[in-house]
């Protein structure tokens, strides 16, 4: 009898300890009819991190327990706020789940101060078809709804029925939708990964998954993330099939939790009071030709130099022009919208290299006007950023008809004039970047060591006003 009583006391103590991890649980309707809602679990000791969870179910139903509610204690114990999303089934109305997921992300961010959450540390998690939804929000959503990190369990990634999961494809896109190649490609999220803009991710799946082929789904997403240089990890377990979720009977359950915990511990969110720096530019800012440019391009090096009191983001986009009539205008891209939504405190603009190309410079009369438009958009932001206009670095070779004479005689005088008119800082990269030996073979893009030199020049300019 004493042993039984002792066991009961121990069990009650464990249950009480578990209950302490969650300070508050409640359900919040996202639609007026309650068809979409969030079950919210706020931790006793909040770390500021949050995760919005999208259970799977082939876009026909939701596995709300082992891919939803059962995870609450795991996250709350780490101080992570956890939100299980009940999203509406699409029945061929492919925008419906995305609308619910984006609303959930915005709701969490809008309530950040009340729920003790860092707006810049909100992740998304999804399983199977819910993994497809999570990856869709990660790649297609606008900045305010896009997560800071993604956790994808055995995700459906391809919307091609024979490559992904036929039921998910037909339920999301409909009978006619799966015949529309553009629509299928749009929702095949490995095709929508964007360098610097798609958040870091971890993908977890079993090698023997027979329902959602790993190679054309989870592995394909990882491959694309790695190809563009985004941060991504993958854990493939020997067995487990499809749909193991939080089931403790799965042999690799404890290892999976350990792997996920270590990954979550491997990165920190920016400080809430960090000074936000947006690096706007073309492929030179992007880090074209530098493997893992997200970590080794000039903005990443600038981040290391400035320290954790700053949050530096890379908004470089290859081939883009300042000119709105150029072949690929920067201000028509998601990266530009992201840079504005970031509400930067400091902006570094380095554009003009591609504008010097023969077919773009025919619109030279509008170069100053378009630069002024960009500056005006930034000055109108509530964050009132300090703006630095950079001259392009030298074009050491005339690759792709990029013309250094046009840069020197046509662009730089205009950039200086706009900088003076708007009281912007001017960083003369063209004069200060003299490192022809630190360029790639094309003579246009700096190599890794050249990116370090660029970061040093820009850091020096920013530091003068620190």
Region annotations inferred by a language model:
Residues 103-168, 184-185, 189:
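Primarily recognizes the serine-hydrolase "nucleophile elbow" in alpha/beta-hydrolase
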Residues 219-271, 441-444, 448, 452, ...:
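C-terminal catalytic histidine-bearing segment of alpha/beta-hydrolase fold enzymes
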Residues 63-70, 83-119, 248-255:
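Catalytic nucleophile-loop/oxyanion-hole region of alpha/beta-hydrolase
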Residues 241-247, 290, 393-466:
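Catalytic His-Asp segment of secreted/periplasmic serine-dependent ester chemistry enzymes
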Residues 48-56:
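Short beta-strand element of the alpha/beta-hydrolase
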């Amino acid at each position: 009898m004493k042993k039984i009583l002792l066991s009961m006391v121990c069990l009650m103590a464990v249950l009480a300890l578990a209950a302490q991890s969650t300070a508050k649980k409640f359900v919040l309707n996202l639609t007026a009819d309650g068809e979409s809602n969030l079950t919210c679990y706020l931790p006793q000791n909040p770390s500021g991190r949050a995760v919005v969870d999208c259970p799977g179910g082939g876009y026909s139903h939701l596995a709300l327990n082992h891919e939803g509610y059962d995870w609450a204690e795991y996250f709350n114990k780490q101080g992570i706020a956890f939100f299980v999303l009940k999203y509406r089934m699409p029945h061929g109305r492919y925008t419906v789940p995305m609308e619910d997921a984006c609303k959930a992300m915005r709701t969490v961010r809008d309530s950040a101060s009340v729920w003790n959450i860092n707006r810049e540390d909100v992740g998304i998690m999804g399983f199977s078809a819910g993994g497809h939804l999570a990856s869709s929000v990660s790649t297609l959503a606008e900045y305010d709804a896009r997560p800071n990190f993604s956790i994808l369990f055995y995700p459906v990634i391809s919307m091609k029925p024979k490559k992904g999961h036929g039921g998910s494809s037909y339920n999301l896109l409909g009978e006619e939708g799966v015949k529309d190649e553009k629509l299928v490609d749009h929702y095949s999220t490995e095709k929508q990964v964007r360098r610097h803009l798609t958040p870091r991710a971890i993908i977890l799946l079993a090698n023997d998954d027979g329902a959602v082929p790993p190679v054309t789904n989870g592995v394909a997403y990882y491959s694309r993330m790695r190809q563009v240089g985004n941060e991504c990890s993958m854990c493939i377990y020997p067995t487990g099939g499809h749909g193991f979720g939080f089931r403790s009977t799965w042999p690799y359950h404890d290892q999976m939790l350990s792997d996920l915990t270590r990954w979550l511990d491997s990165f920190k969110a920016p400080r809430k009071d960090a000074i936000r720096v947006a690096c706007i530019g073309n492929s030179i800012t992007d880090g074209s030709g530098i493997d893992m440019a997200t970590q080794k391009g000039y903005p990443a090096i600038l981040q290391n130099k400035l320290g954790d009191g700053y949050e530096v983001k890379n908004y470089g986009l290859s081939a883009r022009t300042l000119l709105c009539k150029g072949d690929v205008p920067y201000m028509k891209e998601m990266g530009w919208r992201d840079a504005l939504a970031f509400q930067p405190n400091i902006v570094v603009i380095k554009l003009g290299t591609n504008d010097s190309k023969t077919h773009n410079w025919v619109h030279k009369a509008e170069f100053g006007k378009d630069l002024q438009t960009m500056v005006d958009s930034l000055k109108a932001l509530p964050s009132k950023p300090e703006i630095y206009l950079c001259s392009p670095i030298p074009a050491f070779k005339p690759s792709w008809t990029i013309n250094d004479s046009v840069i020197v005689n046509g662009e730089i005088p205009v950039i200086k004039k706009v900088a003076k008119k708007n009281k912007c800082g001017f960083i003369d990269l063209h004069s200060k970047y003299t490192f022809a030996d630190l360029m790639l073979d094309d003579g246009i893009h700096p190599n890794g060591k050249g990116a370090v030199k660029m970061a040093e020049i820009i850091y020096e300019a920013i530091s003068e006003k620190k």
